[in-house]
């Protein structure tokens, strides 16, 4: 997915642009205790999320990457909800945070729709916004995070 991903290295240098560095980055993600999830359409991976544990046991940083051909069709929402559900239920996370480009309107809409809110007082620049979501939100408490059973032509799985 990442070899054809656009825009390359557009936000915080991720995903890495050069192929050798991309391979190193993916290897680090798999071997450093990062929780990884992928979404595929039966032929190839079209999305990837990761939860990186923070200094506190019940917090993590989230990153999400959706191939440009699949943005706006629900795959990102399904993958995001599945990842958050796993973080809430299996990892017992109390807080999930991420950074997003302030100009990325599609991502901001998606994130806000699943409960992320801007972090007040964060050192945000015009192009970057820190957001967080309490994992003990009503969606997780009410068993509404049903993302692994979505009706899209995609499959979501933990890697």
Regions found by a protein language model. Give the residues of each.
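A structural signal for short, well-ordered beta-strand segments
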Residues: 49, 62, 98, 127-129
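C-terminal "cap" of GNAT-fold acetyltransferases
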Residues: 121-159
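Structured catalytic core of nucleotide-sugar glycosyltransferases
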Residues: 2-12, 17, 26, 83, ...
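Conserved GNAT acetyl-CoA-binding A-motif
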Residues: 87-100
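Conserved acetyl-CoA-binding loop-helix of GNAT-fold acetyltransferases
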Residues: 66, 72-87, 109-113
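Conserved acetyl-CoA-binding loop of GNAT-fold acetyltransferases
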Residues: 112-122
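Acetyl-CoA-dependent GNAT
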Residues: 4, 12-61, 67
């Amino acid at each position: 997915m990442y070899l054809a991903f656009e825009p390359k290295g557009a936000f915080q240098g991720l995903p890495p642009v050069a192929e050798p560095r991309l391979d190193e980055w993916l290897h680090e993600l798999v071997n450093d205790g990062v929780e990884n999830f992928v979404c595929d359409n039966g032929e190839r991976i079209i999305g990837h999320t990761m939860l990186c544990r923070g200094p506190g046991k019940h917090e993590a940083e989230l990153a999400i990457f959706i191939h440009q051909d699949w943005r706006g069709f629900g795959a990102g929402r399904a993958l995001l909800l599945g990842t958050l559900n796993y973080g809430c239920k299996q990892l017992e996370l109390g807080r999930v945070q991420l950074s997003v480009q302030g100009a990325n309107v599609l991502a901001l809409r998606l994130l806000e729709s699943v409960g992320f809110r801007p972090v007040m007082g964060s050192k945000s620049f015009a192009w970057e916004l820190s957001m967080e979501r309490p994992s003990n939100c009503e969606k997780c408490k009410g068993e509404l995070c049903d993302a692994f059973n979505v009706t899209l032509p995609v499959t979501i799985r933990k890697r």
